[in-house]
Amino acid sequence: MPSEKTFKQRRSFEQRVEDVRLIREQHPTKIPVIIERYKGEKQLPVLDKTKFLVPDHVNMSELIKIIRRRLQLNANQAFFLLVNGHSMVSVSTPISEVYESERDEDGFLYMVYASQETFGTAMAV
């Protein structure tokens, strides 16, 4: 069973800043993204990992397809993805644009997923 602690709870701010610095140095065309299951989610499984390096040209719809595939969801299973726990993002938006406007002060871009709109406005795909 994966840890119940969030990525931010498992790694100090300084560790996360250093992680991003190394990632951006070694992979300048990749966006460091943390994707975690919404804390109240019961239906969707937990991802096998939370840290993703996403090519900067990928748009949100491609990222959603990747996550749905990793979760092994079928076509009729609901899936909502929120950036920073609150922001709806157009599926055609490149991840690089989302990163520029929504990245955390530690340098990571944080997203949560759930099977319902339990947290207000969400993006259904």
From Swiss-Prot:
Task: Please indicate which residues carry the site annotation Cleavage.
Answer: 120-121
Q: Where in the cell is it found?
A: Cytoplasmic vesicle, Autophagosome membrane; Endomembrane system; Mitochondrion membrane; Cytoplasm, Cytoskeleton
Q: Where is the lipid attached (Phosphatidylethanolamine amidated glycine)?
A: 120
A GO CC annotation given for this chain = endomembrane system
Under the heading PANTHER family, the entry gives:
MICROTUBULE-ASSOCIATED PROTEINS 1A/1B LIGHT CHAIN 3-RELATED
What is the taxonomic lineage of the source species? Eukaryota, Metazoa, Chordata, Craniata, Vertebrata
Q: What is this protein called?
A: Microtubule-associated protein 1 light chain 3 beta
Keyword Metal-binding applies: no
The annotated topology with respect to the bilayer is:
Lipid-anchor
Key word Translocase present:
no
Query: InterPro entries, alphabetically?
Result: Atg8-like, Ubiquitin-like_domsf
Which parts of this protein are propeptide?
Answer: 121-125
Q: Which residues form a coiled coil?
A: none
The protein's organism comes out as Mus musculus
Q: For this chain's UniProt record, which GO biological process terms are given?
A: autophagy; cellular response to starvation; establishment of localization in cell; mitophagy; mucus secretion; positive regulation of mucus secretion
